[in-house]
Curated annotation (Swiss-Prot):
It comes from the Bacteria. This is UPF0738 protein BCE33L1094. Belongs to the UPF0738 family. Pfam families: UPF0738. InterPro entries: UPF0738. It comes from Bacillus cereus (strain ZK / E33L).
């Protein structure tokens, strides 16, 4: 997927959690938050959607970053993604993930591996 930004690690700062993504050829300036999150069951990731005038850009947040994300959610910490040294707030991420976690809990439609991973971290 060429319109995908892959998060590799997290960085904690006072009152902020930064999802550090690999450098990308995607032009980050001009992107805006879509306030929508999808689930990638195959890759055990949450996918935050950014957009510009012509396309959607998918920020993949893998399960390896979920513990830090859950802690940030519990402490009402603002979450950002950093791509090519530019930081963007992932608006609505907390609410979207909370909604998804409620739907994923015990729901085999998401696949046993994802359900287990989500329940382990978020419940």
């Amino acid at each position: 997927m060429q319109n995908k930004i892959q998060v590799k690690s997290v960085e904690k700062r006072e009152n902020a959690l930064i999802f550090c993504a690999e450098n990308s050829e995607i032009e980050v300036k001009g992107l805006s938050a879509r306030n929508h999150v999808l689930v990638d069951s195959d890759n055990l990731s949450f996918i935050y959607i950014l957009e510009n005038e012509s396309s959607f850009i998918y920020v993949s947040i893998p399960h390896t970053c979920w513990e830090a994300m859950h802690e940030a959610m519990n402490n009402d910490v603002v979450m950002f993604v950093r791509v090519n040294d530019i930081e963007m707030e992932l608006e609505g991420l907390k609410e979207e993930v909370e909604y998804l976690v409620e739907n994923i809990e015990g729901n085999a439609n998401y696949g046993e591996e994802l359900v287990t991973a989500v329940e382990k971290v978020f419940l």
